A protein has these predicted regions:
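Non-catalytic positions within long, well-ordered alpha-helices that form the structural scaffold/packing
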Residues: 30-33, 124
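Charged catalytic cores and adjacent phosphate/nucleic-acid-binding surfaces used
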Residues: 1-15, 21-27, 91-104, 121, ...
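Short polybasic/polar patches that bind polyanions
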Residues: 30, 75, 176
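Ser/Thr-glycine-rich phosphate-binding loops at phosphate-binding pockets of nucleotides
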Residues: 11-12, 35-40, 44-48
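Active-site flanking residues adjacent to catalytic metal/cofactor-binding acidic residues
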Residues: 7, 40, 85, 133, ...
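Extended substrate/RNA-proximal surfaces in nucleic-acid metabolism proteins
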Residues: 2, 43-157, 162-163, 218, ...
Length: 240
């Protein structure tokens, strides 16, 4: 058996740019044949829908609510819902944080004050991994003079279904420079997006939570879903 998982998507509960709820995303991905999704809503410095004036504990619980809502539907459909987050750290650059949960966020109320390096160290200490999201995305809000943090991340998102031509090939070249974990993701923001089904990873077994997902990524047991095709290696992909 092969099980498809979305590694990068956003819900309207937590991401200001998203158009669908996490429950709607679960139903859409289930209908598209996925076994599960990883919900990676924008965190404190990103395009968040969560009130930044809330006390830290309430704010973090709000960031977790989209996941809890999605899991209710996921459990009904026997569909895996996994919590993660997308962290903007400056200059329009972002990393995907996998393997931490609400308890980690509540225990680290100084996250807004610490550097990315310190944040990554804490994620690693908690057993998580950090993936550079769309490292060469070129948009008006991204400072292209600032490169990705390839020195501290565990992996590279090589294929992003929302990227423009030319952006993913650069990510692939970066991924070749080290034994990185490589991911592919849709970066989907609405349940009606026709790109659902185009991106993700494919595993020979199911993963039910963030710890199991991280273990699978560290083991590199996954294949890649790129442009709707299942590939053994990312090098096989047409990223142009």
């Amino acid at each position: 058996m092969e099980y498809r998982y979305e590694t990068h998507c956003h819900s309207s509960q937590c991401s200001g740019c998203a158009k669908s709820t996490s429950q709607e995303l679960v139903r859409a991905y289930h209908a598209a044949g996925y076994a599960g999704l990883v919900l990676t809503d924008h965190f404190i410095w990103g395009n968040t829908a969560v009130d930044k004036n809330l006390p830290w504990d309430q704010r973090m619980k709000a960031y977790y609510q989209g996941y809890l809502d999605a899991k209710v539907v996921g459990d009904e459909l026997d569909f895996d819902v996994i919590y993660a987050l997308e962290h903007a750290y400056g200059d329009g650059k972002e990393v995907l944080i996998y393997g931490v949960e609400l308890d980690f966020l509540l225990a680290n109320p100084d996250i807004p004050e610490i550097t990315l390096d310190e944040f990554v160290d804490r994620v690693h200490a908690a057993g998580g991994i950090v993936i550079q999201a769309h490292p060469y995305r070129d948009r008006y809000y991204v400072n292209m003079a600032v490169g990705p943090r390839a020195d501290i991340v565990d992996g590279i998102e090589v294929y992003n279904a929302c990227n423009k031509p030319g952006e993913d090939p650069q990510a692939l070249e970066l991924a070749k420079t080290k034994d990185y974990i490589i991911t592919a993701g849709g970066d989907i923001h609405k349940a009606s997006d026709e790109r659902i089904g185009m991106a993700g990873i494919v595993l020979p077994y199911r993963v039910h939570n963030s710890k199991e997902f991280v273990a699978a990524m560290k083991a590199k047991d996954h294949k890649f879903l790129v442009n709707g095709n299942i590939l053994d290696t990312i090098a096989e992909a047409d990223l142009t």
